[in-house]
Regions:
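Short alpha-helix boundary/capping and kink motifs at helix termini
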Residues: 2-102, 106-113, 117-125
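Amphipathic, charge-rich alpha-helical segments that serve as recognition/docking helices
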Residues: 122-150
Length: 150
C-alpha cells in the first residue's frame, strides 16, 4: 500500500474537509489570509535560506528563552543524526552582529558540545524590539518550526 501523498493532494483534502472539522473554518481562514497580506505589506517575508555561523555569533535572550535543560541536550545528543538536524532560527538586529536564537537553543548547545564549530541558522533580520519574544511565543504555542530533534 502506498502511503505517500503529494502536498497538493493533502492541501486539497484539507480545503475540502476543514470546513466540517474546524469550527468557523471559513471565517478564520479568511482572517489568516488577510493577516498574512498585512504582514507582507509591512515587509515581513519568510526567511530565505540557511547559513552556517560560528558559535561565537550566537546568543540567548533569557528574558525570552527558557533555561537550557542538560537532560534535554543529552537526549538530543544521544539520538543525534545530522541528516535530520534542522537549522536553528535566530533574529539579527541592525545594531548588532549577535544572532539571538528564538528556536533551537537546545539543538545549538548539543551541536556545540558534539564539536561543531559552526551551526546552521535561518536568520530573520528585524529591528522590532520584541520580535524574538513574539517569535518564541508563536513557535512554542503553535508548534510552528518545531523539529523532531528539539
Amino acid at each position: 500500500m502506498n502511503k505517500v501523498k503529494m502536498l497538493s493532494d493533502v492541501v486539497a483534502e484539507v480545503r475540502k474537509e476543514a470546513p466540517e472539522d474546524v469550527p468557523n473554518w471559513s471565517k478564520r481562514y479568511e482572517e489568516a489570509k488577510q493577516n498574512l497580506q498585512n504582514q507582507i505589506m509591512k515587509g515581513r517575508m519568510l526567511p530565505r535560506g540557511v547559513e552556517d555561523h560560528p558559535l561565537a555569533d550566537f546568543g540567548f535572550n533569557y528574558s525570552v528563552q527558557r533555561d537550557v535543560r542538560a537532560g534535554h541536550v543529552m537526549n538530543i545528543m544521544r539520538k543525534f543524526d545530522p541528516r535530520v538536524c534542522c537549522p536553528v532560527s535566530a533574529v539579527k538586529r541592525s545594531d548588532s552582529n549577535t544572532l539571538y536564537i528564538f528556536d533551537g537553543q537546545h539543538r545549538a548547545v548539543a551541536l556545540a558540545l558534539l564539536g561543531y564549530e559552526k551551526i546552521p541558522v535561518t536568520i530573520v533580520e528585524t529591528d522590532e524590539p520584541a520580535f524574538d519574544a513574539e517569535a518564541f511565543e508563536i513557535v512554542n504555542d503553535s508548534g510552528i518550526l518545531r523539529a523532531g530533534t528539539e
